[in-house]
């Protein structure tokens, strides 16, 4: 089963995947889709508030944040990692629960990136916002670092995220029943 959608002027067929026995989601993956990544970054930047740095979470937000930073001429964007790396110093972390991840995860931020965010306007970016848990974790990292969240952006808003007045997104992504019909 697939869900056909148009985003940033491009049509894509998204596979419908089970989360559990009663809930299915459309799998939206920008990895490897340069045309879609470039188009979505352009559309989001046209709607973005003024910011100093973009932050995203590993992994699916990386190509989007990279392309947004490239198109905007930003020298750097900030990445919250799923695990600490040997080269990271003064690390701090927050816990996250996501609809696309089976178990609890942590996000880690390097102290050098945290120092860059202090007192700066930070734009939080991800590919899809659904439950908002990943977004909350990114916000907690920004706040812990002393940054000011100036906006929240995603390519797609799924489920309840579609009703968030604080979220800027390109398209709505419905949730699905096991038979592939859209949940009401």
Residue positions per predicted region:
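A short helix->loop->beta-strand "cap" motif at the edges of active sites that frequently abuts
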Residues: 73-75, 146-147
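Short Gly/Thr/Asp-enriched flexible loops that form oxyanion-binding sites at enzyme active sites
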Residues: 64-72, 139
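Short, hinge-like loop/turn segments at secondary-structure boundaries
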Residues: 72, 94-99, 168-171
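Short glycine-rich phosphate-binding loop at a beta-alpha junction
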Residues: 51-58
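Short, glycine/charge-rich flexible loops or terminal/linker lids adjacent to PRPP-binding catalytic cores
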Residues: 77-122
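Gly/Ser/Thr-rich loops at beta-strand to alpha-helix junctions
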Residues: 58-64, 131
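Active-site-facing substrate-recognition patch
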Residues: 1-51
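PRPP-dependent phosphoribosyltransferase catalytic core
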Residues: 2-4, 136-184
């Amino acid at each position: 089963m697939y869900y056909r959608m148009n985003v940033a002027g491009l049509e894509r067929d998204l596979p419908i995947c089970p989360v559990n026995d009663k809930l299915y989601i459309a799998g939206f993956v920008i990895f490897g889709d340069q045309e879609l990544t470039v188009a979505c970054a352009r559309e989001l930047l046209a709607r973005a508030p003024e910011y100093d740095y973009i932050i995203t979470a590993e992994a699916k937000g990386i190509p989007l944040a990279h392309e947004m930073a490239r198109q905007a001429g930003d020298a750097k964007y900030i990445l919250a990692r799923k695990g600490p790396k040997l080269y990271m110093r003064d690390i701090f972390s927050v816990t996250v629960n996501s609809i696309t991840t089976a178990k609890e995860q942590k996000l880690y931020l390097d102290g050098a990136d945290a120092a860059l965010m202090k007192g700066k306007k930070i734009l939080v970016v991800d590919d899809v916002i659904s439950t908002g848990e990943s977004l909350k974790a990114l916000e907690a990292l920004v706040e812990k670092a002393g940054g000011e969240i100036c906006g929240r952006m995603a390519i797609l808003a799924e489920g309840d995220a579609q009703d968030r007045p604080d979220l800027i997104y390109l398209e709505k992504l419905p949730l699905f029943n096991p038979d592939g019909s859209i949940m009401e």
